[in-house]
Amino acid sequence: MASTTPEVKPGTTLHLLAGSSAGLISAFTLQPFDLLKTRLQQQQRANVGYRSSISRELKKLARFKDLWRGALPSTLRTSVGAGLYFTILSQTRTYVAQLRARTDKLPHSQTSVLPKLSALDNLSAGFVVRAVVGFITMPITIIKTRFESNMYNYNSMYEGVEGIYLDGKEKGSLRNFFKGTIATLARDCPYAGLYVLFYESMKNEFVPKTLILFDQQEQLENSTLVNSSAAVVASSLATTITAPFDAIKTRLQLDSHTVGGNSIMSVTKQLLKEDGGVRNLFRGLSLRFGRKGLSAAISWCIYEELLKSGRLQRLLH
């Protein structure tokens, strides 16, 4: 039965709070995936022929809680980044929808309170917003990566900031906090654009049509399953396409004295020359699959459900 209650659109504060909460929970829960992925991708300097593996990296850990090393910068980066990303993305998509006069012609999805856009609009919005947020959060991204690696033994955020600031050829330069920016954006921008494109397509078309075969009435209860399923599929597709830039980004942010220089081209050549060849560009892909898929399912599910939470909206008004 259709409700006569007028729809209350989520405000900017709600988007920021929902996005930050979703990012915080997913980042802390899935930190072990990030730590192991970083260690698989880092250069094995002690033995050129040595090839690391998940089991070998797990055996190196002295305590179970070491899997959460780097959790503080990771949660800071993801909660702040997710809050900004979801907020700016929502505002951008709403603006584009209004600009194209589609708000009346294209109603909201039954499983979402977000505006519906064309495939190109979704791709462009995700790409541009991720570029902005990625640049803003780049310093904390480098701190996070170095905390996760066993190449650096930082014991505090202060040590991490100081170590990066005084590191490499650019000693005492703020540029050190933006190493690997191009590689990171080359990974994150296409990923975000493709993710939003795949997510909206899956959420509004493929997944609902699949689920309706099993349940034609419980729309509200199914919304969580629809959003989570769409998020996992979208994340898997986008992750595979952008995997090489993830390996390049990690190596750039960890190695201060890379042979041949610190550039995307030089690092790519170095990765290809190392034992494993082209496969090195996809090292850690299985962990990134798991991390990104679960993170997307958790983040977007929590985000969209919080947006639809009447109680939370009332608290903010």
From Swiss-Prot:
Its main location: mitochondrion. GO terms for cellular component: mitochondrial inner membrane. It is a multi-pass membrane protein. It catalyses: glycine(in) = glycine(out). GO terms for molecular function: glycine transmembrane transporter activity. It is found in: Mitochondrion inner membrane. Keywords: Membrane, Mitochondrion, Mitochondrion inner membrane, Repeat, Transmembrane, Transmembrane helix, Transport. The chain crosses the membrane at residues 16-41, 70-96, 123-148, 180-203, 226-252, 284-302. GO terms for biological process: glycine import into mitochondrion. Solcar repeats lie at residues 10-95, 117-205, 222-309. HAMAP family: SLC25A38. Mitochondrial glycine transporter that imports glycine into the mitochondrial matrix. Plays an important role in providing glycine for the first enzymatic step in heme biosynthesis, the condensation of glycine with succinyl-CoA to produce 5-aminolevulinate (ALA) in the mitochondrial matrix. Belongs to the mitochondrial carrier (TC 2.A.29) family. SLC25A38 subfamily. This is Mitochondrial glycine transporter.
